[in-house]
């Protein structure tokens, strides 16, 4: 920004759009937003609280009463069939062990004994707080709903019964891949399998280029085999073409083909990319096999797996889910999958199928609600844009250093070379990116007084004037994906109808609705794709993630699932299985890196295009940047901060684990009185969320609920044993329980949040530039 509201430098979009609403500073919000929520009513976990009992005088009588209350609460949770059904989907091995046995004995009217009771009470309470207090987007315990932002002043309106409108089960990609590998081992199938070049390898000028290896000149026999590979021909067809070209013995051609496979240059077999229906992609490949005696048997085995996976969506109740998942496992065995290929995943809680659901809720958010976000959210997004630009500068400086170092050791540097040399930077950003985050917090400290001794309520117009100076416009955006950011916004509503927005997280340089789960559960997926196409009007360069890439799954991003047809370019850095729709991907070894006017450019000349290296690495940049948006560094106590009617920072506390007064042993303090006194002395409210080292997500704690305090004590105790200085973070629950607005037909309340997409008015200067003329050789083995 130049210091005057609305004035920007850089490349401004000229697109006139009706699919967005406008915010301050040129920012826009998609009109469609996802509603994420808890799957079980908040009242289920509220019933764990016994405030009146805890207020009684300490002593043995109170301790006995608390233990009796815990037993009754545990029994009530075990009897909750919906909770145990959620547990069966998430952790079937656990659900089918002591929870099932205990529930069966309760149902029979007995008073069952439970070994290791205190620990197991905490385990069940931990699952309960997740299903009741954490906003999710998975299964029926995190069913996806949708909201629409409209121009009318209608406040908050919603319709629907609040339950599940649609349930769909999907086969995991890894399970489909295990089936493919099993079918490939069927006698008589090998010569019918397709052969393709390793996605990151390239063949040009008589040389084979592989990642992390020097180029190798191939022999006449290898050349004949490689020339015959076009990504479609089968083993038998490749061998026939090679034999016709060389006149060599068939056994020699086969040996060379296998040698190239074992070296990693070639891949033989079915492609199973990440997709919501990987079994259908596999089926299409099997249907192309020419021999019906082989083809029909493979299809029958695959169809058995697909049918079992589809039927799992109809399972209701923990026992039925366990049975359905067992049927899927049996179908995998029947298809030839080994225990080694599937058991390891199952032992880590990865079921071969997953469930995604559409919640029976439709929300309308009126302009009178969104208008209150215009200035505060616009300021936050300005600082997110600044953050992304600074990260880009820091990462490119590191990439340039690596590129120059590589250039002293070879004649040309490929994208594969640079990615390997700068792997640490692309994975974490390194110290330079940490310094950018610190700079962000220092700049925000000019707006938010670090020494505040009470909650801050700031006026948006004053904050805007400061933000214009603190977060100036960086000029053209540095990579395409940084045009989109995803704020998670919670809405609180009091009994008298007053509302207040709360910022949960702001995901920088990432559209979190690109996850496949949102596309499959959207009523109109084309709307999401069309909005993406307009946001990415200049194109985008996207890596094709291998199946084993960290974080890559069929249901979440990466890989992206809102690709506008023909708009993106793709490149491959590992042995991926391609894009499901068959888009051509450029090998990383076929992209050479050059410095032009101080910027690194990747040229895929054999494919006819080039792009800035930051664009090639854009998805990695987004992964580095997405969670950096933290406005304040940790401190023992930080007060709540609002800009106009948006809470941008909730009240929070941080402590070394060794200073939290947890009992030395489980059950050593039935009422956890010292923990409650500690929280009260620190000024904490009754309802908080806590994050401890080793836990991926924060968890809910009610200081009036002994079972939830036991869960807190266990987590803190483990953290302190590992490192007494490990930091425990506590944040107020906001909206508070009495401000939850989402209800079902029975009036039960649920936690919820809106996942929105914000779009910058600025765009990249350029993404893809046409260079050269694609060569025939460059198309080999795509």
Residue ranges: model-predicted function:
Residues 207-208, 273, 599-602:
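Hydrophobic residues embedded in beta-strands of well-ordered beta-sheets
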């Amino acid at each position: 920004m130049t210091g005057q509201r609305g004035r920007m430098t850089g490349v401004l979009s000229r697109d006139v759009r009706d699919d967005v609403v406008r915010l301050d500073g040129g920012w826009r919000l998609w009109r469609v937003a996802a509603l994420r929520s808890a799957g079980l009513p908040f009242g289920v976990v509220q019933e764990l609280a016994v405030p009146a009992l805890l207020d009684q005088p300490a002593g043995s009588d109170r301790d006995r009463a608390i233990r009796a209350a815990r037993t009754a609460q545990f029994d009530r949770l075990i009897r909750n069939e919906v909770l145990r059904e959620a547990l069966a989907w998430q952790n079937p091995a656990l659900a089918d062990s002591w929870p099932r046995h205990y529930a069966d004995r309760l149902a029979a009217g007995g008073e069952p004994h439970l070994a290791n009771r205190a620990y197991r009470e905490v385990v069940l309470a931990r699952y309960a707080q997740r299903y009741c207090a954490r906003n999710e987007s998975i299964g029926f315990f995190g069913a996806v709903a949708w909201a629409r932002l409209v121009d009318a002043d209608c406040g908050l309106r919603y319709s629907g019964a609040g339950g599940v409108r649609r349930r769909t089960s999907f086969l995991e990609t890894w399970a489909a891949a295990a089936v493919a590998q099993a079918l490939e081992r069927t006698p008589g199938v090998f010569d019918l399998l397709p052969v393709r070049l390793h996605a990151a390898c390239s063949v040009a000028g008589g040389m084979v280029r592989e990642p992390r290896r020097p180029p190798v000149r191939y022999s006449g026999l290898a050349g004949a085999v490689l020339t015959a590979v076009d990504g479609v021909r089968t083993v038998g067809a490749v061998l026939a073409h090679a034999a016709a070209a060389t006149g060599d013995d068939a056994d020699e051609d086969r040996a060379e083909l296998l040698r190239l496979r074992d070296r990693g240059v070639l891949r033989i077999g079915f492609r199973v990319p990440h997709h919501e229906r990987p079994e259908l992609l596999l089926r299409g490949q099997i249907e192309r096999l020419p021999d019906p005696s082989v083809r029909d048997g493979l299809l029958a085995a695959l169809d058995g797996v697909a049918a079992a996976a589809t039927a799992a969506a109809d399972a209701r109740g923990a026992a039925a889910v366990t049975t359905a998942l067992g049927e899927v496992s049996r179908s995998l065995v029947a298809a030839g999958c080994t225990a080694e290929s599937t058991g390891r995943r199952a032992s880590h809680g990865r079921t071969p199928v997953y469930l995604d659901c559409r919640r029976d809720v439709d929300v309308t958010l009126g302009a009178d609600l969104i208008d209150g976000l215009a200035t505060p959210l616009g300021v936050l997004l300005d600082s997110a844009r600044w953050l992304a630009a600074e990260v880009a500068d820091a990462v490119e400086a590191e990439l340039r250093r690596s590129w120059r170092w590589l250039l002293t050791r070879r004649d040309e540097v490929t994208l594969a070379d640079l990615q390997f040399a700068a792997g640490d930077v692309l994975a974490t950003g390194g110290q330079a990116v940490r310094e950018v985050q610190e700079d962000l917090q220092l700049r925000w400290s000019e707006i938010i007084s670090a020494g505040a001794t009470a909650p801050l309520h700031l006026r948006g117009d004053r904050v805007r004037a400061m933000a214009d100076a603190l977060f100036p416009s960086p000029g053209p955006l540095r990579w395409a994906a940084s045009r989109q950011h995803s704020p998670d916004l919670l809405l609180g509503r009091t009994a008298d109808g007053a509302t207040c927005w709360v910022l949960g997280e702001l995901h920088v340089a990432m559209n979190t609705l690109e996850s496949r789960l949102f596309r499959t559960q959207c009523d109109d997926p084309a709307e999401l794709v069309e909005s993406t196409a307009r946001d990415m009007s200049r194109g985008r360069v996207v890596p094709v993630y291998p199946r084993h890439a960290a974080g890559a799954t069929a249901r979440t991003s990466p890989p992206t699932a809102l690709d506008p047809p023909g708009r993106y370019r793709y490149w491959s850095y590992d042995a991926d299985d391609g894009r499901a729709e068959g888009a051509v991907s450029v090998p990383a070894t076929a992209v050479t890196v050059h410095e032009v006017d101080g910027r690194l450019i990747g040229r895929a000349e054999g494919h006819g295009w080039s792009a800035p290296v930051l664009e090639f690495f854009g998805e990695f940049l987004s992964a580095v940047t997405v969670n950096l948006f933290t406005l304040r560094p940790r401190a023992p106590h930080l007060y709540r901060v609002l800009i106009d009617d948006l809470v941008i920072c909730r009240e929070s506390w941080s402590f070394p684990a060794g200073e939290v007064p947890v009992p030395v042993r489980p059950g050593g303090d039935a009422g956890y009185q010292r923990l409650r006194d500690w929280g009260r002395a620190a000024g904490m409210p009754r309802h908080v969320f806590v994050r401890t080292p080793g836990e991926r997500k924060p968890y809910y704690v009610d200081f009036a609920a002994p079972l939830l305090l036991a869960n807190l004590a266990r987590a803190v105790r483990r953290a302190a044993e590992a490192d007494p200085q490990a930091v425990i973070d506590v944040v107020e629950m906001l909206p508070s329980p009495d401000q939850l607005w989402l209800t079902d037909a029975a009036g039960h309340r649920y936690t919820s949040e809106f996942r929105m997409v914000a779009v910058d008015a600025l765009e990249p200067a350029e993404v893809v530039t046409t260079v050269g003329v694609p060569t025939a050789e460059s198309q080999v083995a795509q």
